[in-house]
Amino acid sequence: MGCVILESLEHLEPLAGWKPVAERVAEMPDDPDATVWHVCWYQVDEASLRERLPALARAMRPHWYAHFWADDDLCVVLAGRFFWARASDRSTWQEFIAYGDSVGVERRWTENISTQLPAWVEAALRRSAPWRRSPLDPHVT
């Protein structure tokens, strides 16, 4: 699972063919880079992610990041580079935190990357479950 804010990318080509499982528009009036964020969550397999990581890193703007995880594997994409770490071991985060400093990503972001889905994303995943037949079906909860 991963989160990409569309405004974080110079262009959207690295996301071609990936369909968000959840999307939200957030107003960020105090952000100097983008006052509106299009927050997209993607469920992608590891092979697809690994194939696209270099392109995502090249397209990532300074001051921004994206992140993906599965189990305890955490991948953080920053401008020009991507990093693998263990989500449960903060000592493995130091390299991407330091690099984030160099590309203008504040530590309040890089030191607090969540591997928990927001409730609104969990709800979207439940609504889009492939076994659902119809929202009007009384047997679907």
Where are these regions (language model features)?
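Terminal targeting/leader modules
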Residues: 1-91, 116, 121-141
